[in-house]
């Protein structure tokens, strides 16, 4: 997907990018490749692949109507190089984005990236989601939590649901279908106060399958969750 094909694909969803936004994506690509030589951000560095598998894929929640141009708050867990939240932020600057990442080098990259791209209302937090999930400054404060290929749903639910306001949504983006994961995660989602709403299946323009699971927070997450860092991955709720 060339940059021009990226723009054309967005126009099919009635999204027209300004010259400023086009340049922001271009600079994003340049910085991603430049920093990837210093720290491991992505295995995908070829320009057309970045535009398809990082930029286009990241904005799927916008393309499929899950996130609109409202000043809602989004927490991105394990965003790595800023995916999916920062491409969405470029398209809808009104979004208030917070990113949690456990690796300080990635936070340094994201700090420079957001400054270079002129992105405002972006908060970067260095640490573990399990720790911030018990912090009253962040717990039950976000409209959306996004996570792209971070963990199985049973584990991801514990990482994320505590951060959501009531009626807020977890958007889990993955290549594979969620059917098997949902069966495993059903109990965890319920215990944590969530409810599976739907799965959106779609294809990238090259035919690759992608899926978004939408989980809505229906009630308060019990205070004991998330458990201490490392525990959810080692001992998922069953």
UniProtKB/Swiss-Prot annotation:
Gene3D superfamilies: Vaccinia Virus protein VP39. This is Ribosomal RNA small subunit methyltransferase G. GO terms for cellular component: cytosol. Specifically methylates the N7 position of a guanine in 16S rRNA. The gene is rsmG. The keyword Lipid biosynthesis does not apply. Keywords: Cytoplasm, Methyltransferase, rRNA processing, S-adenosyl-L-methionine, Transferase. It is found in: Cytoplasm. It comes from Lactococcus lactis subsp. cremoris (strain SK11). It holds the Pfam family GidB. GO terms for molecular function: rRNA (guanine-N7-)-methyltransferase activity. PANTHER family: S-ADENOSYL-L-METHIONINE-DEPENDENT METHYLTRANSFERASES SUPERFAMILY PROTEIN. The keyword Transferase applies. InterPro entries: rRNA_ssu_MeTfrase_G, SAM-dependent_MTases_sf. S-adenosyl-L-methionine binds at residues 78, 83, 129-130, 148. Its EC number is 2.1.1.-. Residues 217-238 are annotated as: Disordered. Disulfide bonds: none annotated. It comes from the Bacteria.
């Amino acid at each position: 997907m060339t940059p021009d094909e990226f723009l054309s694909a967005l126009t099919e969803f009635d999204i027209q990018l300004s010259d400023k936004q086009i340049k922001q994506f271009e600079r994003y690509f340049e910085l991603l490749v430049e920093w990837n030589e210093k720290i491991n951000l992505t295995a995908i560095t070829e320009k057309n692949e970045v535009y398809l598998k990082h930029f286009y894929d990241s904005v799927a929640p916008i393309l499929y109507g899950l996130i609109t141009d409202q000043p809602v708050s989004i927490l991105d867990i394990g965003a790595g190089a800023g995916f999916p939240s920062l491409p969405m932020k470029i398209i809808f600057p009104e979004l208030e984005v917070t990113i949690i990442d456990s690796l300080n080098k990635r936070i340094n990259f994201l700090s420079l990236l957001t400054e270079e791209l002129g992105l405002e209302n972006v908060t970067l937090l260095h640490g573990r989601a399990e720790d911030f999930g018990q912090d009253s400054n962040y717990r039950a404060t976000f409209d959306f939590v996004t996570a792209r290929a971070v963990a199985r749903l049973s584990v991801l639910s514990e990482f994320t649901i505590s951060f959501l306001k009531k009626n807020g949504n977890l958007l889990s983006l993955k290549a594979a279908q969620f059917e098997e994961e949902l069966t495993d995660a059903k109990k965890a989602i319920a215990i944590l106060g969530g409810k599976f709403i739907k799965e959106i299946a779609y294809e990238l323009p090259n035919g690759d399958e992608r899926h978004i699971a939408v989980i809505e927070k229906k009630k308060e997450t019990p205070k004991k969750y998330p458990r201490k860092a490392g525990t959810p991955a080692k001992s998922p709720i069953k």
